[in-house]
Every structure is written in C-alpha cells, then in structure tokens.
Amino acid sequence: MALVLHTYKGNKSAEKALIAAEYVGVQIDVPSDFQMGVTNKTPAFLKMNPIGKVPVLETPEGSVFESNAIARYVSRLNGDNSLNGSSLIEYAQIEQWIDFSSLEIYASILRWFGPRMGFMPYSAPAEEGAISTLKRALDALNTHLTSNTYLVGHSITLADIITVCNLNLGFATVMTKKFTSEFPHVERYFWTVVNQPNFTKVLGDVKQTEAVPPIASKKAAQPAKPKEEPKKKEAPVAEAPKLAEEEEAPKPKAKNPLDLLPPSPMVLDDWKRLYSNTKSNFREVAIKGFWDMYDPEGYSLWFCDYKYNDENMVSFVTLNKVGGFLQRMDLARKYSFGKMLICGSEGPFKVKGLWLFRGPEIPKFIMDEVYDMELYEWTKVDISDEAQKERVSQMIEDAEPFEGEALLDAKCFK
C-alpha cells in the first residue's frame, strides 16, 4: 500500500510532509477527489482521525494525524538523510525549533490572520497581542539567523521545512514586505529555503502578500440585495456608499481605550529596558528607577493571589498553569508588566503575582479576554502603605525567601 495524504488542495499544513518526502525520496499520493466538509466527515475518514481534521497520512501500518507528526514520520522513512541531524544534540535542537516555530510563530500568525478572515471573532487588542508576540518570535529567529544559514547545522533539516512552511502562511497572508523588512535575516533565510528545488516542487512560485486583508464583515456577505433590483438604478447607487460606510464604521473603534488616556510621564518600555538590562545592584538601580518612574495617575499596581493553591501539588503542572496564563496575557503586553512567583519547596505551591497596568483600573479588555483573571484575587496596591510598597519591590527583584518561603520559580511578563 502506498502512502496516502488525505487533505484538500492548497493546505499549507500538508506541505511539510510533501517537502520532507521530496528530501527522503518517497512517493506520497494525494487524492484529487478530496472534498473538505464531505470526505473528512465519512466513517472511513473518522476512523483515521476521530475529530475529522486534516491532513491525515494513511500508511500500511496505520494512520497518522497532526501535520508535524506526519512530517516527522515521513522524514524517518529513509534513514540515509540528514533531516533529523547527525547527533543527539542536533536532534534536540531540531525539535526545539519545530516547537518554537509552531507555538510562537504559526500560532501568532493564525491569531492575526484568522479573525481577519472571519474564522474567529475579531478583537483589536487580541490582534495587537498576536502581532506583538509574532514580532518577538521573529526577532529571536532573526538573531539566530544572523550567524546561521539554517536553523541547525549546515544543511536543511526538518526544522527548516516546518519553520518555513509556518512562515509561508504569514508571508502569503498578513506579513507584508514592510512588516518583514524589520527582520532581514529571516527574509534572507525564507527566500533562500523556499527557492530550493525540493521546496519549489511542492510550493511552486511563492509570493509575498502586498497588503493585510481587511477585517471580515458580516455585511460584506450580503451584496446580493442590490443585485436583486437591477432595474432600480437609483436605489443601489444610493445605498452602495451607505454599505461601504457601515463596513468602515468599526475602524475607529479599533483604537484601544488605553491609547486615549492622558499622556503619562512613565514610559513603560523604558522601565522594561531598565529591568532587563540591570545585571547587578538590582535594588539600587532597577528598583529605585522603578519608583522614580512610577506614575500613580497614569498606571496602577495590583497584587494577585491564586484562589486554588490547594490544587497546586505538582511543580511542573503549577509552572505550566502560570505559563499558560502569561501566554494568554500577550494581548496586554503593550500596556502591562507582571511578575509571577511560585512559592514553596513542595506542594501545595502558592502562586502570587504583581502587575502594573496602564490606567487606574485593570483594563476591561483583559478581564473580558483572559479567563485566567477570574482564577485570582486582585488587590490594588496602596503605595502610601510602606509595607505594600516594600512587597512590590521584593516581588520585582525576586527576593528569596519571599514571605518566609523558597521560590520554586519567578516568571516575568514584559
């Protein structure tokens, strides 16, 4: 039985396995009669993937779903190749970049692109968060590629295949030349790799989008109404501009309310740089600098305490819980700074946090968008209380012990 990749035409997630197949020299058949929404709902398909997602690879030994898993399987079909590295450390680094490009790059591109296409609800703050996270990831990738042609070693590996396929979604949809020009080494890397023969066989002639797609509008899906009355020329002509105006109307609302607050003498990015760049004498330099900068009129400080600490019996589960919270806070990165302390040498671990937010209250869009907020008790800091002020300083500098307990970990959101 030949390998069969069940997917629809143009599925960018399926391209990873097809490119890997070119490198290892194996044949993969792609059925031409696959219909999304039909074929993937059949009993035969659901036996291969119970939730009906594509792509799915059918092999003589069984089926495999999830695009990265499929690409990994294909890359190992012929052992005489370098796609998985030549040593254990190279293999680990390949896996590292696969995870990085999937979790940091691809996920952020989807969160930017998806809402604009109507695949999920659009939120301006959420889009800002996605773009901010994507830029941070691309900046890290750009730094690595400053002195490296490929991600691992001196030839193309599976990490390059998956990363470039992930980048290709962004280049094709939302990442314009103006956007990617901030990351010249990423640009060089992307165009070098997509023009390799084994890539062009699958991807064809890759082009970069010239514009970010407009936000999908429900009203845009109703152009048939004017066409139903073609003889009444005056009505459609008069109504068409109104439709356009209605579609344009949401654009001013995209402005985040926090951007409309009176200017603050505290520049959040200046504080974040001071925090990151202070390597010694932290209390004398960074903490003193924070209080010199802090503007209680333009910003507010908040303590948070996890409500269900008795559940935090396993260290890595607790750390993952906090890490997930910080990931979901990405939409607020422009307007906030946070420290999360995981306290205790054994379970149950206590999770305590300190957050700096733009404005006098916790921004409403954060409360609405980040479900984790409800899992914490929030208390506004009274900086006139020297004990509370000292607690803020200790949390910023990861003082240990903190309130009589060792620190399992301290995470910074900046």
From Swiss-Prot:
Residues 87-215 form the GST C-terminal domain. Disulfide bonds: none annotated. GO terms for cellular component: cytosol; extracellular region; plasmodesma; vacuole. It comes from the Eukaryota. Residues 225-236 have a biased composition (Basic and acidic residues). Residues 254-414 form the EF-1-gamma C-terminal domain. GO terms for molecular function: glutathione transferase activity; translation elongation factor activity. InterPro entries: EF-1-gamma_plant, EF1B_G_C, EF1B_G_C_sf, Glutathione-S-Trfase_C-like, Glutathione-S-Trfase_C_sf, Glutathione_S-Trfase, Glutathione_S-Trfase_N, GST_C. Keywords: Elongation factor, Protein biosynthesis. Residues 1-82 form the GST N-terminal domain. Residues 214-224 have a biased composition (Low complexity). PROSITE patterns: EF1G_C (PS50040), GST_CTER (PS50405), GST_NTER (PS50404). The keyword Protein biosynthesis applies. SMART domains: EF1G. Probably plays a role in anchoring the complex to other cellular components. EF-1 is composed of four subunits: alpha, beta, delta, and gamma. This is Probable elongation factor 1-gamma 1. It comes from Arabidopsis thaliana.
